């Protein structure tokens, strides 16, 4: 699924509106993923706590959203732009790529909750397409 010029512009516009709350979005989305899909906790067994609001969840939520923010700037070539992150997740962290989609779903939920007026159906569509493209780019090294 490719991103049109309109999709890219919509993602950039929405990211600009929500980026000030990206840490909160990341922490909430990660907390939701860990609660709704408890099997994902296996990747974080070294943490003291996977509970919502724990320092580890907040920190990793911030890291995730910083990575997504970087991806927003590399939308024209996500595969090449995220090569290092793809290699990290495939070879070192060994994250099942299915989890990228699970996290994306939770990010969409949190964005809709936090930005009900800005997260229009068109914004939802564009951000969803972007997160799908991002997940695909991160999965590239698994092939």
From Swiss-Prot:
Keyword Ribosomal protein attributed: no
Name the Pfam families for this protein.
Globin
Q: Which GO terms describe its biological process?
A: hydrogen peroxide catabolic process
| One GO MF term attached to the UniProt entry | haptoglobin binding
Q: Which CDD domains match?
A: Hb-alpha-like
* One Gene Ontology cellular component annotation held by this UniProt entry: hemoglobin complex
Q: Which residues form the Globin domain?
A: 2-143
Q: List the disulfide bonds.
A: none
Tissue expression notes: Red blood cells.
Q: Which UniProt keywords apply?
A: Acetylation, Heme, Iron, Metal-binding, Oxygen transport, Transport
Q: Which residues bind O2?
A: 60
Q: Where does heme b bind?
A: 89
Task: Give the modified residues of type N-acetylserine.
Answer: 2
| Family assignment from sequence similarity | Belongs to the globin family.
Cited PANTHER family: HEMOGLOBIN FAMILY MEMBER (PTHR11442), HEMOGLOBIN SUBUNIT ZETA (PTHR11442:SF41)
Q: How does it assemble?
A: Hb 2 is a heterotetramer of two alpha-2 and two beta-1 chains. Hb 3 is a heterotetramer of two alpha-2 and two beta-2 chains.
| Further comment found in the protein's record | Hb 3 displays a Bohr effect, which is enhanced by organophosphates, and a Root effect, which is enhanced by ATP.
Instruction: Briefly state the protein's biological role.
Output: Involved in oxygen transport from gills to the various peripheral tissues.
What protein am I looking at? Hemoglobin subunit alpha-2
């Amino acid at each position: 699924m490719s991103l049109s010029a309109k999709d890219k512009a919509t993602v950039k516009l929405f990211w600009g509106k929500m980026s000030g709350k990206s840490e909160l979005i990341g922490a909430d989305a990660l907390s939701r993923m860990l609660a709704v899909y408890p099997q994902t906790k296996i990747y974080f067994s070294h943490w003291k706590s996977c509970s919502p609001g724990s320092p580890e969840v907040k920190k990793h939520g911030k890291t995730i959203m910083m990575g997504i923010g970087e991806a927003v700037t590399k939308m024209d070539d996500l595969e090449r732009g995220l090569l290092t992150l793809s290699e990290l997740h495939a070879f070192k962290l060994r994250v099942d790529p299915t989890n990228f989609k699970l996290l994306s779903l939770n990010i969409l939920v949190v964005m809709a909750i936090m930005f009900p007026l800005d997260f229009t159906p068109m914004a939802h569509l564009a951000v969803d397409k972007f997160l799908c493209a991002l997940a695909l780019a991160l999965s590239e090294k698994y092939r």
